[in-house]
Design a protein with these regions (language model features):
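Conserved NAD(P)H cofactor-binding loop of Rossmann-fold oxidoreductase domains
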Residues: 81-85, 123-124
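Flexible, glycine-rich beta-alpha linker
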Residues: 128, 147-148, 172-190
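Short alpha-helical oligomerization interface
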Residues: 88-103, 137-145
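Active-site Tyr-X1-5-Lys
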Residues: 130-133, 144-172
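Glycine/proline-rich active-site loop of Rossmann-fold NAD(P)-dependent oxidoreductases
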Residues: 154, 167, 180-193, 203, ...
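N-terminal Rossmann/SDR dinucleotide-binding element
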Residues: 1-77
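Conserved Rossmann-fold NAD(P)-dependent oxidoreductase catalytic core, especially the SDR/UDP-sugar
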Residues: 105-148
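C-terminal substrate-binding subdomain of Rossmann-fold SDR/epimerase-dehydratase oxidoreductases
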Residues: 208-211, 215-331
Length: 331
């Protein structure tokens, strides 16, 4: 039996893969997004699946607009992925809070008023701040975020808990770290995916951070969001998502090996987020979730980029921008 899902930020990276997976199994999808730009959806979805989507243009900072859209959708499940990334929140904290905190409150309130069954939202491993050692952190580890983005995400977790305690709205916040795959094209941790794209274009690329990070294939991330929307128990839950904890050097080696050239380099400080997180809690609740090995995920991503290039549909705008600016190019 198909379900109706209301999705914010559906035209972002994780959102596009969530939509793809839901569409392929025949669910009804209502997309609430401030942009009509569907290039990320068209990059990974079949035209027939895209034609079945319902689009509502709107901004999560507009409380009335999202209330009306969610009510009219008759959706029982909400997946909230809209938000600004770390650089935008650091550059303009007030604007970041308006979108990431007030916008999320608007989604929570709209979900309460619409009587939805469950809301799943994107939190982040950025809530932890910098880890003191390499020990994988569980959900109860101290929350000392080192970015405005991390503070905003931690605030959202608290607000979701209050909405359950006060109104009985069930929710799940998921904390991914470094997500990679087709459509990951914004934010500092998008550099590895951009490097994969640059490599198939035979363009040098420089990743702007070093150290270890928890690296998860976007298809697996999307599957976790959908599993929580479908099966999470009543309550206000927060779970870590874990892929593989690897050194950036290892990622670079895999990309260069698959490209057959030494095109990708890296340097810079580690990202201010723990390098390893523990996902035992979500696996206890939901059982086994997809976990694509790093080399397989990188290989699939690079093959998808090649297929898009050969079809004349590969978006290279972010690579071209950095070519002109000299930003993340190999130095």
């Amino acid at each position: 039996m198909s379900e109706t899902y209301f999705i914010t930020g559906a035209q972002g990276c994780i959102g596009s893969w969530v939509v793809k997976a839901l569409a392929e199994r025949g669910d009804t999808i209502v997309i609430f997004d401030r942009s009509a730009d569907s290039r990320r959806l068209t990059a990974i979805m079949k035209p027939g699946d895209i034609h079945r989507l319902r689009f509502v243009i709107g901004d999560i900072t507009d409380a009335a607009a999202i209330r009306v859209a969610l009510q009219e959708s008759s959706a029982r499940r909400v997946i909230h992925l809209a938000g600004l990334q770390v650089p935008a929140c650091q550059a303009e904290p007030a604007a970041g809070a308006l979108v990431n905190v007030i916008g999320t409150l608007n989604v929570l309130e709209a979900a309460r008023l619409a009587g939805v069954e469950r809301l799943v939202y994107a939190s982040s491993a950025a809530v932890f701040g910098i880890g003191e050692d390499d020990t994988p952190l569980d959900e109860g580890a101290a929350s000392e975020p080192g970015t405005h983005y991390g503070v905003f995400k931690r605030t959202n977790e608290g607000n979701a808990r209050v909405y359950f305690l006060t109104h009985g709205l069930s929710s799940v916040g998921l904390r991914p770290l470094t997500v990679y795959g087709v459509n990951r094209d914004s934010g500092l941790t998008s550099d590895p995916t951009k490097a994969m794209k640059a490599a198939i274009l035979r363009v040098p690329f420089h990743i702007r951070f070093s150290g270890a990070t928890d690296f998860q294939y976007v298809r697996d991330t999307a599957a976790a969001f959908i599993a929580c929307a479908d099966r999470a128990p009543v309550g206000a839950h927060v779970f870590n998502l874990h892929g593989e904890t690897v050194e950036v050097a290892s990622i670079v080696n895999v990309i260069n090996e698959k490209a057959g050239q030494e095109l990708v380099t890296f340097s810079g400080p580690p990202i201010p987020i723990p390098s390893a997180i523990n996902d035992a809690a979500i696996r206890r609740m939901l059982g086994n979730l997809p976990s694509t090995p790093l080399e397989v995920g990188i290989g699939e991503t690079m093959r998808q980029f090649v297929e898009l290039r050969e079809a004349g549909r590969l978006d290279t705008s972010e690579i071209e921008t950095e070519l002109r600016a000299g930003g993340a190019l190999a130095r």
